[in-house]
Amino acid sequence: TVERNAPDWVAITTAPGQMKDVYLPDSTLVALAGDSWIRYDAKRYDKERRAVEMNGKAFFQVTRNEARPFSVKTSQTEVTVLGTSFQIDEKPTVTEVNVVTGKVCFTAGEEKENVILTAGMSAQYSMENKEITVVTEEDVNKLAWRTGQLRFMESPLDKVIEDLSDYYQVKIANQTKNEGARLTATFNNLPLEDVLQVVNQTLDARLVSTSKK
């Protein structure tokens, strides 16, 4: 009987720098970022519920099915939805959820603290503080690895550096005197050198990429 109930795991893995689109049995789309994995039990998936486990970063576009909620588990958190699109990014100390459409329930920690997030909202769970922080302002750059677009609206230099470092996977040094500078610009699939040139010229700044992260 143990054998019969044993999970039949289907696992999909990506190498660093690789991206992969995966369709689950219910047509839910999972876009895996580099150095990530996802798995589900083929025997049980879409029977009573739709449960997935993951590590790393992934974007989900969930096929709506009110009878069978969809849930994603990371090491410390869980997201449950009916039908929506959202991203989970699990880093060593923080797990972040960004909701693009629909509504999700984000549960975290041993206390099973939970928050409801709607389109445009995001939340972070800190492993250190054991707390969920909710952000109501939408940050489109969190999805730049999927869209190829980086958008800045009156963004301070620190935010620009953080987003560029994350997107291009490099370290960027700020050798700028102009600390209070803010950037308004949109970049579509541009190489880092071009972006840095625009930022430096526009803001009279000096940002230099130093190395791979």
Locate predicted features.
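A residue-level detector for the "anchor" residue at the start of short, highly conserved motifs
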Residues: T1-K213
